Design a protein with these regions (language model features):
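Membrane-interfacial helix-loop connectors
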Residues: 37-47, 83-84, 136-173, 186-206, ...
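Transmembrane helical segments that form the transport core of multi-pass membrane transport proteins
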Residues: 57-65, 85, 102, 107, ...
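Structural signature of hydrophobic alpha-helical transmembrane segments
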Residues: 1-8, 85-96, 138-146, 176, ...
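Hydrophobic mid-bilayer segments of alpha-helices in multi-pass membrane transport proteins
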Residues: 3-13, 23-69, 87-99, 250-260, ...
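Cytoplasmic-side transmembrane-helix entry/capping segments in multi-pass membrane proteins
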Residues: 26-35, 116-128, 162-172, 313-317, ...
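Hydrophobic alpha-helical transmembrane segments
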Residues: 6, 28-32, 91, 126-131, ...
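Alpha-helical transmembrane segments of multipass membrane proteins
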Residues: 13-17, 35-39, 134-135, 219, ...
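Juxtamembrane and boundary regions of transmembrane helices in multi-pass small-molecule transporters
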Residues: 4, 23, 161-164, 168, ...
């Protein structure tokens, strides 16, 4: 049965990787393989439980006679809910942060972006919009930032070819900026939530690689742009029934929202509660502020104008379902012992985290950066560390400790490696939907640049590991 579960999940990964050909939604596939895997697991639960948790199961029985019903109760209460809780922590954090962005956007807190980007110099515009994207993505999340910046760019640049180039640069900047912090992408968030790294150490290590992964391709893309471009400053959205906030009120709301997100790592270190609790606290505070400053409006929950296309907002919901499905899928692989076997094979035949990092990047380019990150991170992220007990090399084992180099390589390669092909990230898929970009065009014009920039970042990480 373990072979069947593994086969189903591998087939699901292949279907997700070829989603642009099959037109089958990744979120649907992820939820299917995640749920079916657990259904098959619990149907043959006795063998798996006695293999992975014999002591815990016998202790839970407390002398009662074991049977199929008892083992199902044990799995549901002591195994399955543990993984559901971990997945829910990530999903709730994403829900909170994306709602924060929606509240800020509906109140015009991001209206300052378009005016500061106004210029007819194409290269200046490229650096401005990617810099803003990089900074915002590091503080919010790369998916929401990409969606917001693509909408702004689409309204300002009338030329389709230039929109395609600028859109690709936005995706690169968003993914690189998101990889810089633990709250900037689902990959870093999941690793941070699992306790394998800390926020400050993670950002310090990835600062230079992420900057180079953004600057190198952007510098090259700037050479293919004309000197000047036609620019259309989008009209400010009508907010007669939306909001009557003045500039200082919008700045206050922006400070509460963004400043609150900055405080979440500190909140986690002080309270040891899951980061999503801090995100929900920030959301509730911002919500209260929103109600206070907009108390004079009637029907304040009905907005006149939606800033983002519904197809992209629908993608945000799909992302949360995708995250849940992938985390359930990698969890069932862990419970059947697949990751433990793979870790032992890697320790004996590969024994190099750099080889794993390169493989991670290439897999992420065709699969999905979050699915790839969770897959390679789950190989060694076992609560009891059983997969490393047989490894005698202390230096090698230390790479898998808290803040070990392995976790940074997996996070960086999965996030930036997803830029090699446009289909490797949710941000890239959002760009494909909005600008109708084909994968072949992207590979010819941007994919090679993304590959080079990713390898440059890996080289920097290698240099840092040698120096430290």
């Amino acid at each position: 049965m373990a072979f069947i579960i593994v086969a189903i999940i591998i087939i699901g990964y292949v279907v997700m990787a070829t989603g642009n050909i099959t037109n089958i939604n990744k979120s649907a596939v992820a939820m299917f393989v995640g749920t079916v895997g657990w259904v098959l697991y619990i149907c043959f639960g006795t063998d798996f439980v006695m293999s992975q948790h014999p002591g815990d199961y016998l202790s839970w029985l407390s002398g009662t006679v074991p049977n199929s019903v008892a083992v199902k109760h044990f799995i549901a209460e002591n195994i399955f809910l543990l993984y559901v809780g971990r997945a829910a922590e990530v999903v709730l954090f994403l829900l909170a942060t994306m709602t924060i962005v929606e509240i800020l956007d509906n109140n015009g807190c991001f209206d300052f972006i378009a005016p500061i980007l106004r210029t007819r110099k194409s290269r200046k515009y490229l650096w401005l919009i990617t810099l803003v994207t990089f900074v915002i993505s590091a503080n919010l999340d790369n998916i929401t930032t990409t969606t917001m910046m693509l909408v702004v760019m689409h309204q300002m640049v009338p030329n389709r070819r230039l929109r395609m180039l600028y859109g690709c640069a936005i995706v690169l900047a968003a993914n690189c900026g998101g990889a810089l912090t633990v709250i900037g992408s689902p990959e870093g968030l999941a690793l941070w939530n699992n306790g394998v790294l800390t926020a400050t150490n993670y950002s310090m290590w990835l600062l230079v690689p992420c900057l180079l992964a953004w600057v190198v391709p952007t510098l090259w893309l700037s050479r293919s742009l004309p000197e000047r471009i036609d620019m259309e400053l989008p009209a400010m959205p009508y907010r007669g029934d939306d909001t009557n906030l003045n500039v200082w009120q919008r700045v206050m709301m922006l400070f509460v929202g963004i400043g609150g997100l900055w405080f979440i790592p500190t909140f986690h270190n002080i309270t040891k509660l899951s980061p999503f609790v801090g995100a929900l606290c920030v959301l509730s505070l911002l919500w209260i502020v929103n109600e206070i400053v907009n108390h004079r409006l009637m029907n304040a929950d009905q907005m006149i104008q939606r800033r983002m296309p519904r197809v992209l907002q629908y993608g945000v919901i799909q992302l949360m379902l995708f995250v849940m499905g992938i985390m359930l899928a990698v969890a069932v692989m862990q419970e059947i012992g697949a990751w433990a076997w793979l870790a032992q094979w890697l320790d004996h035949h590969v024994r190099s985290i750099w080889v794993v990092a390169v493989v991670t990047g290439f897999v992420s380019s065709v699969l999905d950066n979050f699915a790839t990150c969770m897959t390679f991170a789950s190989i060694y992220a076992l609560p009891d560390g059983d997969t490393l007990q047989q490894v005698s090399d202390a230096a090698y084992r230390s790479q898998f400790d808290v803040n070990g180099l392995y976790w940074k390589l997996v996070a960086y390669s999965s996030a930036v490696g997803g830029n090699i092909f446009l289909i490797g990230s949710a941000s890239g898929l959002a760009l494909m939907k909005l600008e109708r970009i084909r994968v072949g065009w992207y590979i010819r014009n941007v994919g090679v640049l993304s590959l080079v920039s990713w390898l440059v970042g890996l080289l920097v990480l290698w240099g840092l590991s040698v120096l430290m």
